[in-house]
Amino acid sequence: MSSYLFCPSNIQKYIDNAINSNATVIVPDLEDSVPDSEKLNGLDNILNILKSDSIKNKTIIPRIDTSYLDIELQVSKITELDFHGLIIPDVKNTQSVKNVIKYINKSKLEKISVIPLIESIDGINNLKSIIQDNNINTIAFGKYDLGLSLRIDSEEADKLIDYIKLRFVYDSLSLSCIPIDTPELNINNINLFKEKCIISKSMGFKAKFAVHPTQLDIINDIFNTSEYNKDEIIFIINKFEKLSAEGIGTFKYKNNIIDLPIYKHLKNIYGS
């Protein structure tokens, strides 16, 4: 899974644009991009998306809100439906994850991607325990709130951010956890965005967030080279389906975690 596209969950036009885009994962957002007064409306829109037959071939992983909306309300409503995972914002420690996953049925928890978004000093310092204590397979980095946490401009202090990114990637990959890189809010300078994507991949990131559909082709072109040949893809698909029927939602292949989003992505490659 190479590109994760954020879209405000309270604005139908942006949701439709995301669904019709070539994002490998769509992230309807309930956090920063949605005013508090619109969050319940956004939650209703996410539930309607997950109920819709038109998104059956799409991977939908909402980012929930942990500062305004009731966590149990969001998680209980979303997990009643067919969903692929959740992104948890501003995860500072292992308890931040447990405060969310305690509302997810264990059998479902084993089949979905719970993705902590690390965007603070505490989150970086507690990264290994966050991954290990919660069996996390995919984890995300956010530079903008991290910059606020460090009292720096994350764009101006790019060398420091790159240093932290390298530590983030190393700690993640050493624990067989897939790292996703931060979004870039400058959507006008495409050449700069491409350069950032190339650097990101060279650091070891496996995917990147997008905030606009125009960023997707660049992300997909740079990150979306499959490391598996056709025979391996068929093997992975068959093994995932067999294990899934037995109630197992992930397995390890060539030092990589195969979960539902990876399975759906490889299924799309094999079918294309």
What are these model-derived regions, one by one?
Residues M1-S272:
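Expand to "…catalyze enediolate/carbanion chemistry for C-C bond making/breaking, isomerization
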